[in-house]
From Swiss-Prot:
PANTHER family: DNA-DIRECTED RNA POLYMERASE, DNA-DIRECTED RNA POLYMERASE SUBUNIT BETA
Family designation: Belongs to the RNA polymerase beta' chain family.
CDD domains linked: RNAP_beta'_C, RNAP_beta'_N
The protein's name in its UniProt record: DNA-directed RNA polymerase subunit beta'
Catalytic activity: RNA(n) + a ribonucleoside 5'-triphosphate = RNA(n+1) + diphosphate
GO molecular function terms noted in the UniProt entry: DNA binding; DNA-directed RNA polymerase activity; magnesium ion binding; zinc ion binding
Pfam families given in the database record: RNA_pol_Rpb1_1 (PF04997), RNA_pol_Rpb1_2 (PF00623), RNA_pol_Rpb1_3 (PF04983), RNA_pol_Rpb1_4 (PF05000), RNA_pol_Rpb1_5 (PF04998)
Length: 1391
């Protein structure tokens, strides 16, 4: 026998078994009894005098085991030698006391009780199985009604409910011919007598014969539950309990406090209540008490058990002495403080500490300063070991003493221990994987951790009192992973976008910018130097200044054919500072990268180039040197802020006067009634917005240039050396918007609801604010702070949902071999290329050959990873679109393949197997969310709103073409007025390639013609941004219909002007029901008073006024084509901010149907309008075969198509927000992906955040992972059920192999919350949200969790199947397969 096992009796053979899956089910009464070590009969806990557990009570030692190790309760048997003996006096087995954590007991219930989860967790499972309503079942269970369990020969129905009076009447009538019961017994009887297999047959037949949709849904649901029971072999009556398991006592402890009181777990109270009621019920049954008393006791028992299992699920929650609800078993596992999230997914760890961080500017990138005191504590065991090994201490106790006395040898040993032993630093909140990085510790005095300044960006740390936690990786493997994967110097690129995240900021940028700026006519200008050393000497002897323009010979290193560096000497026109900087450049980085004023963007490009050209190691060293240099020169520069640096532009007074005059003019127009109040407000806001911008521009022009005398004595402009300007220009701190507030004007402010206050703050911070101005300013500033707090929570929750939906997505194979993919084009908006094609395809794998459009030769073959070189080549050849692989179309079943994902952004090469790309995607999208939410208040609530666009201009020369949907009429002034809803002007270059595309709104005036040659900067069209006009396409005399004052239109008289206008009233607000359907319209008459018809038809022209329209024509007025009939004022402009942004991202990922969604054409065909019904318009689309599709559209909606127009399937026909589900259904997966990626990117772009499209695609893949079975074929699925895409694919392959009919399915788009909850793994779903519901469902289905994802493995305490853990899982899997093969072979040989 193994000696080691003597001391660990618990490690019996069964404990250490490896498992591959976890199955959940409903426990049968026999199972519960088999777990139990005895029945708990008394509600007592412990004897309050002796503190010993009461016999047969909730803490009984006989049932649950001894209180002290190897000692029975009465003390007859003590010590290890009696191990395993059961004391005959007190009945306690002598063993370890920790069995009290694992031995369960049970309570035999005197009456059966329904399990509340199966009753009340919606939809009620009991109700589904029995086909009864929840209300009915509850009436039976809580003793309000009888249920007929066996009607016998009587006309009663099975499952019929009878009230008490009914029951006694029927008893008198039929005698014992029928059975009816009350309470859980009745329900149990019904469940026991239900023939599951027979019921399934009946339901399947019904499913085929029925036609109604609701019925099919209902049957399918019942079928699913019943089939699950049938498959798993669980019995229906197990949902009703006869016997209740009792939790081991150490998991619900009773702790004596000082002063004779006890602290107890709520569960003990709940169990006591159950036992008390159960015992009382037993006694009443023995005494044959009257029915009514027994019934009441049974009901109370049912309620007690309900509270124990899930308190508060039904009725009022049971409360303890202090009036708060007791914590039941269900509460123990759910929510943030429950078992899953508190103890399984987030544990506290040993060997960790935390302290404040300070800056360590002398550190190297892979180092951090660790206070000696902390190191001593963290590395204690290692030090003890070393002390014993070196013979300085004979025992651990002695070593401990030495460490406590801090003898000198201890410090030497600490140095030794720490050498080459990385530690991990973490800053909360850890929003992405760079929130934990490994460093080599350097021992320092003091109590603060020193952090390298360049990693601050990754941690989002600053030194204003932030704290960080230290963790020590103990095992060799952990140290190795920390060093190779997590060391700060190995994490130069951001996983979100593949750009460097180790980028200098603030003082470093300022120093580098200062040293690389040039000054005109500085000391020693025009000197020639032989090499950098000479420049050094000249600089140190003050012959030249830092910004002096000089010519110098520089030696650069260039790679030759063989890949070796050889020196090349060139002469450069440069400055002293840049020449000095050239010394720290790594080999292979050309001097031209630093031969300019280095701003933050340039430095970022510099580090990026260094990484691509010189590799990781050189880049890290280079970054460090940049930092030291930057700090040094920032100190030498002595750049500071003074009041005089804030120069107020002289033009300010004039500009303000001009704006005030304009505002006065608008006010006058408003008084005359030419504009509405809303328009006036919008225009005033616009004027002030523009005025602010003009003042800001004047101020920046003033700040950025200064006059100097050059060498020849002429006065010239040079870039300013104003400190504030330099800080903003270099990107070190501040921005033009902030300088504008310091020395321009503060500008417009926002109210807390986001609308803009029309009186701006005209003064700036240098002049100071008046009391009123200060008061206006406080609004925005406070809102900013309040927003921040709310949004941080929102953003964290979004990240949590994203991580949850993608956590099991890991790269598992190299190539799935698909040739599917998406076609990538450059993103163009309004003629600006927002994202070039090269940016979008860099680091992707091509799905098909890339062909040169001019020569037709293949540039890049399919299946190639596009590197910078290849992308440049594609860019130069003028290719417009490239088809690339994408995670969405990857065919790998559980996980992704490397080729569909492409480049690992943080490493710059093809992604490795085992990379957890799902989690990285979730972090990359979630992390900036929090950053953005926090970035609202930095401008101090100043309204940042783009002045509304009122025209479009061409950006380049070319030819203007109108899109196919373009419709316009010429008005009597000869202007072309746009009357189409989705019109675009496209500009083609000389070869005919599309260069720009501009949307032109309805009612715009076109200033160009189709096919006209245009120049860059030419205006293409103009319009009024604040109102939408309503324009007539025909000429004639106005005749109103249903335009009745006080019924359909209201006369609005303006208080200020006294003028009145007619405004259309919203139908819902009209008084009588008849008037609700009336539609104010305008018809046109010719000179004879006959209605004018649409040319070529007999339909009279009739145009309806939309709600809120201000009618501008009068009855009987003559109008011409293109004239305005009415104006619809646009809502006032709110500030655009990520506030609208973060919820927008969440809305997209949750795939919510927007409030007033637009409509897409269901089929391709021709549009016509049918008869109106109930105030709705009937729109008909007829396809080529004459099949018509009809839809009703409410009057408020704006229809974008006209009679006779041809539309394509999926084209927008009714204005409104697009519903992503429609896009998926009508245009397919690629269109949907493009839409979501575009919309999400738009939000982030607005904030200047770069995220790779890949990450969004990874999440879309997870949103599309389930499909709806449209026709099950011969695959065994149920029509209409939702299943994993992979499962259908596998089933279809199998069906085709066997020659059966495969299933047809439709794609389904799930929001991220739903997708997380619908995952195959119930452990992952339960730990996410709605724990009770998930577990109830899983138990009924008898689900098995294969532990495929990361989360499940974390919860069961294994290595995750990603990264280095993937190999562990794979090898386990292989061993398991080998064992299976061997057993199979042995069986064959046996036979």
């Amino acid at each position: 026998m193994n000696l080691l096992n003597l001391f660990n009796p618990l490690q019996t053979a069964g404990m250490e078994e490896e498992f591959d899956a976890i199955k959940i089910g409903i426990a049968s009464p026999e199972t519960i009894r088999s777990w139990s070590y005895g029945e708990v009969k008394k509600p007592e806990t412990i004897n309050y005098r002796t503190f010993k557990p009461e016999r047969d009570g909730l803490f009984c030692a006989k049932i649950f085991g001894p209180v002290k190790d190897y000692e029975c309760l009465c003390g007859k048997y003590k010590r290890l030698k009696f191990k395993g003996v059961t004391c005959e006096k007190c009945g306690v087995e002598v063993t370890l006391s920790k069995v009290r954590r694992e031995r369960m007991g049970h309570i035999e219930l005197a009456a059966p009780v329904a399990h509340i989860w199966f009753l009340k967790s919606l939809p009620s499972r009991l109700g589904m199985v029995l086909d009864m309503t929840l209300r009915d079942i509850e009436r039976v269970l809580y003793f309000e009604a009888f249920v007929v369990t066996d009607p016998g020969m009587t006309p009663l129905q099975r499952r019929q409910l009878l009230t008490e009076d009914d029951y006694y009447n029927k008893l008198d009538e039929y005698g014992d011919d029928f059975d009816a019961k009350m309470g859980a017994e009745g329900i149990r009887e019904l469940l026991r007598t239900l023939n599951v297999a027979g019921e399934i047959e009946i339901l399947r037949q019904e499913l085929e014969s029925t036609g109604s949709d609701t019925k099919i849904k209902k049957i399918a649901k019942r079928l699913k539950v019943l089939e699950a029971f049938h498959r798993s072999g669980m019995k229906l009556e197990w949902m009703i309990m006869d016997v209740l398991p009792v939790l081991p006592p150490d998991l619900r402890p009773l702790v004596p406090l000082d002063g004779g009181r006890f602290a107890t777990s709520d569960l003990n109270d709940l169990y006591r209540r159950v036992i008390n009621r159960n015992n009382r019920l037993k006694r009443l049954l023995e005494l044959h008490a009257p029915d009514i008393i027994v019934r009441n006791e049974k009901r109370m028992l049912q309620e007690a058990v309900d509270s124990l299992l899930d308190n508060g699920r039904r009725g009022k929650a049971m409360t303890g002495a202090n009036k708060r609800p007791l914590k039941s078993l269900a509460d123990m596992i759910k929510g943030k403080g429950g078992r899953f999230r508190q103890n399984l997914l987030g544990k506290r760890v040993d060997y960790s500490g935390r302290s404040v961080i300070t800056v360590g500017p002398y550190l190297r990138l892979h180092q951090c300063g660790l206070p000696k005191k902390m190191a001593l504590e963290l590395f204690k065991p290692f030090i003890f070991h070393k002390l014993e090994k070196q013979g300085l201490a004979s025992t651990v106790k002695a070593a401990k003493k030495l460490v406590e006395q801090e003898v000198p040898e201890v410090w030497d040993i600490l140095e030794e221990v720490i050498r080459e032993h990385p530690i991990m630093l973490n800053r909360a909140p850890t929003l992405h994987r760079l929130g934990i990085q490994a460093f080599e510790p350097i021992l320092i005095e003091g109590k603060a951790i020193q952090l390298h300044p360049l990693v601050c960006a990754a941690f989002n740390a600053d030194f204003d009192g932030d704290q960080m936690a230290v963790h020590v990786p103990l095992s060799l493997e952990a140290q190795m992973e920390a060093r190779t994967l997590m060391l700060a110097s190995n994490n130069v690129l951001s996983p979100a976008n593949g750009e460097p995240i180790i980028v200098p900021s603030q003082d470093i940028v300022l120093g580098l910018y200062y040293m690389t700026r040039d000054r005109i006519n500085a000391k020693g200008e025009g000197s020639l130097f032989a090499d950098v050393k000479e420049v050094h000497r000249a600089y140190h002897t003050k012959q030249v200044e830092l910004g002096t323009k000089i010519t110098v010979r520089l030696r650069e290193w260039v790679k030759n054919e063989a890949g070796e560096f050889e020196p090349v000497v060139n002469r450069y026109e440069t400055t002293v500072g840049r020449a000095l900087l050239s010394e720290i450049l790594p080999k292979g980085l050309p001097f031209e990268y630093v031969n300019k004023a280095l701003k933050k963007k340039e430095i970022s490009k510099l580090i990026n180039a260094s990484f691509r050209l010189c590799g990781l190691r050189d880049t890290v060293i280079f970054a460090d040197h940049l930092m030291y240099t930057g700090f040094g020169f920032a100190a030498k520069g002595g750049i500071s802020i003074a009041v005089d640096d804030m120069e107020i532009p002289k033009e300010k007074v004039a500009l303000l006067a001009e704006a005030n005059a304009e505002v006065k003019e608008i006010e006058d127009q408003y008084r005359q009634g030419l504009v509405t109040n809303g328009e006036r407000y919008n225009k005033v806001v616009d004027i002030w917005g523009r005025a602010g911008d003009k003042i800001a521009k004047a101020m920046m022009d003033n700040l950025s240039k200064q006059k100097v005398i050059d060498r020849d004595g002429n006065e010239v402009d040079q870039e300013s050396f104003n400190s504030i300007y330099m800080m903003a220009d270099s990107g070190a701190r501040g921005s033009a918007a902030q300088i504008k507030q310091l020395s321009g004007m503060r500008g417009l402010m926002a109210k807390p609801d986001g609308s803009i206050i029309e009186t701006p703050i005209t003064s700036n911070f240098r002049e100071g604010l008046t009391v009123l101005q200060y008061f206006i300013a406080t609004h925005g500033a406070r809102k900013g702070l309040a927003d921040t707090a709310l949004k941080t929570a929102n953003s964290g929750y979004l990240t949590r949902r994203l991580v949850d939906v993608t956590q099991d997505l890991v790269v598992v194979e190299d190539d799935c071999g698909t040739s599917d993919g998406f076609v990538m084009k450059a993103v163009v908006q309004g003629g600006d290329v927002i994202e070039a094609l090269r940016e979008r395809i860099l680091g992707r794998v091509t799905a098909s050959d890339v062909v040169d459009p001019s020569s037709g030769e293949t540039l890049v073959e399919a299946g190639t990873l596009l590197t910078e070189k290849l992308v440049d080549m594609i860019d130069q050849s003028g290719v417009d679109e490239v088809k690339v692989r994408t995670p969405i179309t990857c065919k790998t079943r559980h996980g992704l393949c490397a080729h569909c994902y492409g480049r690992d952004l943080a490493r710059g090469k093809l992604v490795n197997a085992g990379e957890a790309v799902g989690v990285i995607a979730a972090q990359s999208i979630g992390e900036p969310g929090t950053q953005l939410t926090m970035r609202t208040f930095h401008i101090g609530g100043a309204a940042s709103r783009a002045a509304a666009a009122s025209q479009v201009e061409a950006k380049s020369n070319g030819t203007a073409r109108f899109s196919s949907q373009m419709r316009y009429v010429a008005n009597n002034k000869g202007e072309l007025v746009v009357i189409g809803r989705s019109c675009e002007v496209v500009i083609h270059d000389d070869i005919g390639r599309e260069r720009e595309r501009h949307k032109v709104p309805y009612g715009a005036i076109l200033l160009v013609q189709d096919g006209m040659a245009i120049k860059a900067g030419q205006t293409l069209a103009t319009w009024d941004p604040h109102t939408r006009p309503m324009i007539t396409e025909h000429a004639g005399m106005v005749k109103f219909e249903n335009v009745e004052e006080g019924v359909t239109v209201a006369k609005q008289t303006d208080d200020v002007t006294g003028l009145s206008t007619l405004v259309v009233i919203d139908g819902k607000r009209r008084s009588s029901s008849a008037s609700k359907l009336l539609r104010p319209t305008v018809k046109l008459l010719d000179e004879n008073g006959v209605e004018i018809c649409i040319p070529g038809t007999s339909t009279p022209v009739s145009m309806a006024f939309p709600v809120g329209a201000v009618i501008t024509v009068r009855e009987g007025q003559e109008i011409g084509k293109g004239d305005v009939l009415a104006r619809i004022p646009q809502a006032s402009s709110k500030t655009r901010d990520i506030t609208g942004g973060l919820p927008r991202v969440a809305e997209l990922f949750e795939a919510r149907v927007p409030k007033d969604a637009g409509m897409l054409a269901e089929i391709t065909g021709t549009v016509s309008f049918g008869k109106e019904t109930k105030g709705k318009q009937r729109l008909i689309i007829t396809d080529v075969d004459g099949v018509a599709y009809e839809t009703l559209i409410s009057k408020e909606k704006q229809i974008l198509v006209h009679d006779g127009q041809v539309v394509n399937r999926g084209e927008t026909i009714v204005d409104g927000a697009v519903d992503p589900h429609d896009i998926l259904r009508l245009q397919g997966i690629e269109a949907l992906a493009r839409y979501i990626v575009q919309e999400v990117q738009e939000v982030y772009r607005l904030q200047g955040v770069k995220i790779s499209d890949k990450h969004i695609e990874v999440i879309i893949r997870q949103m599309l992972r389930r499909v709806n079975i449209a026709d099950a074929g011969e695959t065994g699925f149920i029509t209409g059920e939702q299943v994993e895409r992979g499962d259908v694919m596998a089933a279809n392959e199998k069906a085709l192999e066997e020659g059966k009919e495969p299933a047809r399915y439709e794609n389904v788009l799930l929001g991220i919350t739903k997708a997380s909850l619908s995952t195959d793994s119930f452990i992952s779903a339960a730990s996410f949200q709605e724990t009770t519901r998930v577990l109830t469902e899983a138990a009924i289905m008898g689900k098995q969790d294969e532990l495929r994802g990361l989360k499940e493995n974390v919860i069961v305490g294994r290595l995750i199947p990603a990264g280095t853990g993937l190999t562990y899982h794979r090898s386990r899997h292989q061993q398991w397969q080998e064992v299976e093969q061997e057993t199979a072979e042995t069986q064959v040989t046996d036979e």
